[in-house]
Amino acid sequence: MKRGIRRDPFRKRKLGGRAKKVREPTAVNSFYREASLPSVWASLRRREMVRSGARPGQVLSSGRHTGPAKLTNGKKATYLRKIPRFNADSGYSIHSDSESQAETVHGLDGCASLLRDILRNEDSGSETAYLENRSNSRPLESKRYGSKKKRHEKHTIPLVVQKETSSSDNKKQIPNEASARSERDTSDLEQNWSLQDHYRMYSPIIYQALCEHVQTQMSLMNDLTSKNIPNGIPAVPCHAPSHSESQATPHSSYGLCTSTPVWSLQRPPCPPKVHSEVQTDGNSQFASQGKTVSATCTDVLRNSFNTSPGVPCSLPKTDISAIPTLQQLGLVNGILPQQGIHKETDLLKCIQTYLSLFRSHGKETHLDSQTHRSPTQSQPAFLATNEEKCAREQIREATSERKDLNIHVRDTKTVKDVQKAKNVNKTAEKVRIIKYLLGELKALVAEQEDSEIQRLITEMEACISVLPTVSGNTDIQVEIALAMQPLRSENAQLRRQLRILNQQLREQQKTQKPSGAVDCNLELFSLQSLNMSLQNQLEESLKSQELLQSKNEELLKVIENQKDENKKFSSIFKDKDQTILENKQQYDIEITRIKIELEEALVNVKSSQFKLETAEKENQILGITLRQRDAEVTRLRELTRTLQTSMAKLLSDLSVDSARCKPGNNLTKSLLNIHDKQLQHDPAPAHTSIMSYLNKLETNYSFTHSEPLSTIKNEETIEPDKTYENVLSSRGPQNSNTRGMEEASAPGIISALSKQDSDEGSETMALIEDEHNLDNTIYIPFARSTPEKKSPLSKRLSPQPQIRAATTQLVSNSGLAVSGKENKLCTPVICSSSTKEAEDAPEKLSRASDMKDTQLLKKIKEAIGKIPAATKEPEEQTACHGPSGCLSNSLQVKGNTVCDGSVFTSDLMSDWSISSFSTFTSRDEQDFRNGLAALDANIARLQKSLRTGLLEK
């Protein structure tokens, strides 16, 4: 009833903790879990046992990995707790009343009942004769609880009590035996018997299974051995009390840990063969001495080693070198729980053997207490004592194991049945309450008509209907019994084989026991094993040395081959370097040659570029020259037309004055009338009279052939009066095109002429604009003679007649420019020509053109000379009162008369005679007109040839 009282608060706390948000579904889940876990666990165990059968030795490991295990032994449960490292004061009672040890899972109830039925059914018919000699286990429980109150006192429990409590506690620890043993101190159960050798004597199958499981722990134990074995402490057997004695004195002064026992493999009194094994762990060492595997607790060695009557211990002084560590059995300190939960079948194989050993172990401890109390007793004495007791213990073990088994099975079965009935009743009642609550909830929800809540309620009802308590699947003992039947039969066979083997071993020990077996110790076996291992290592090292030598020889050969190859490669590299050097020299020579050629090519390119630039400049100069010549041709044509008109007027005047009236008055009046008519009708009146034009031609022609033009000095720039400006501005549309062309090309002409003067040494032109000139128009006449370079161009452009016409035009043009300069007909221009050009120009003229020009001039002069002298004064008056105003010898400059050294002087006029004027006939007039027409034709031809030349360029 204490157990039920303890578990109810735990259930309430668990329900409250899980129902923080929604209590009803959580409560349903908890009820379902509590009701279904036993059946689930039982079905899983049954399925696993039927499928696995008799497997090799695997041990069930449980505990904190799958939840706390609930094990029953009379009234109280035993709870396991993992202690990773042992301390001297870390003893705790197994049967603690704290709330932390009250946590159980219903799933393990099935395991406990399963083991109880197995043990009860197997031993019910064979060992009933000894049941009346056993006492009930409840007084042992009261003793156990009483010992907790007297924890600081030393107790010596009788041997019978030790046996009974040991067997009963062993039966309590069956479900999670292996994991609990591996997590607790090994000092609680150190005995003189070895379970491994005991299994070997009675059952080869169990021994094989156990050995296979032990072999799996070897790798895990190796690491812990090297880290945790105390240096200098020999492996000695320390025989602690049984499990009941540990519980009776949990906090005694010797400081042993009294948690759940760890079953160690120890030495049998009469082993059949040599089996040296050592199992070590962080705080325990299992040393094999001869045929023994004995355990030691390092906590006992660390403390003062105070022993009580119930705790016999021995510490023989043995050499640490005599302890062979050939094998390690991993059954201590948390190794097995890492392997997980193993199968039940392997556990069931070892259960009966454990139970049969514990009784004999308890007696062995009591009988050998005097022997092991002395810490200085040697190991051979301990072996001899074990051998003397061998026969007696072998006889007792079969009877004692079955008595303890049956007593424990009865106690556990009674408690389990009562508890299970209570649990089933409680679960059924809770299920009914849940169904009622669901019905009420469904009625409330039906009013709201919420489909989702109704669906959830139907699902909850379906889940509750599936519960084992509702469906009637609570009783599974029959199924478990059927599933365990083959295991029971196998267990009976193993028991029979175990008895036979024990009998055979006892006989062999009696007959074949050598006389000197007592003198054999662990040192001999350790030395032999060490010798064998060293021999094996020596052989392996020799083999490895031979292999290394062979490899070394091969490597030496490879090195020699590599040296030869390196020599070959070095020679090849030298040859390559030499060839590369030669190629480099050749390439350098070629590169220098190419550089020289490139430099020459660059020089040629630069020279060609310079020539191209000069040619372009010459082309520009030629273009400017052609434009200037075109302008001069236009101007000459205008002058020719003006001359024709003036000559026609003169001839008409002469024809009118044939009546020989007073020449001065008539001539003057007629000339004034003609001039007035010309101003009214002609938009471009003549600039000069025929006399001035002929005078200019004669003067220019004679001056050009007689002396160079450089003798002409710079003259004063005379400001023209208003009449001259009017004449210049009123030249009309006849020469407006020429003016536009000259104005547009004036800057280029100046720059081109300046360049040509600097390059060729030809004439230089300087334009001086008058400060007082109101007309801003710049008029540049073509006032230069033909250079040497232009005569071949004229020859290329036109045939011989064109050359003659061009020469005539140029010569007359030069005369016009000079006379215009003297008479101030145009904007003052300072002209200077070199002597070379002045002398070379007549030489380039053709003879035919000179003859024609001179003949034409002579004819004109003769015609003019025939005019009577009486016309001298009227002509001068006409020239002075004419529209140009600048034909007179004196010009009005700011009210002052400035004398000009022009050609028109009184000396020239005095040469003319009046009689010569009268001899001017109509035949001469016709010749003059024909000459002017030929001049016009030549001018037109020259202009056409110049235009074609420009188009060709």
Curated annotation (Swiss-Prot):
It is found in: Cytoplasm, Cytoskeleton, Microtubule organizing center, Centrosome, Centriolar satellite. Residues 383-413, 483-618 form a coiled coil. Residues 1-22, 52-72, 126-189, 268-287 are annotated as: Disordered. Residues 1-21, 145-154 have a biased composition (Basic residues). Its main location: cytoplasm. GO terms for cellular component: centriolar satellite; centrosome; ciliary basal body; cilium; cytoplasm; microtubule cytoskeleton. Keywords: Coiled coil, Cytoplasm, Cytoskeleton, Phosphoprotein. Residues 169-187 have a biased composition (Basic and acidic residues). Residues 277-287 have a biased composition (Polar residues). It holds the Pfam family CCDC14. The keyword rRNA processing does not apply. It comes from the Eukaryota. The modification Phosphoserine is found at S124, S670, S754, S798. GO terms for biological process: protein localization to centrosome; substantia nigra development. Negatively regulates centriole duplication. Negatively regulates CEP63 and CDK2 centrosomal localization. PANTHER family: COILED-COIL DOMAIN-CONTAINING PROTEIN 14. Interacts with CEP63. This is Coiled-coil domain-containing protein 14. It comes from Homo sapiens (Human).
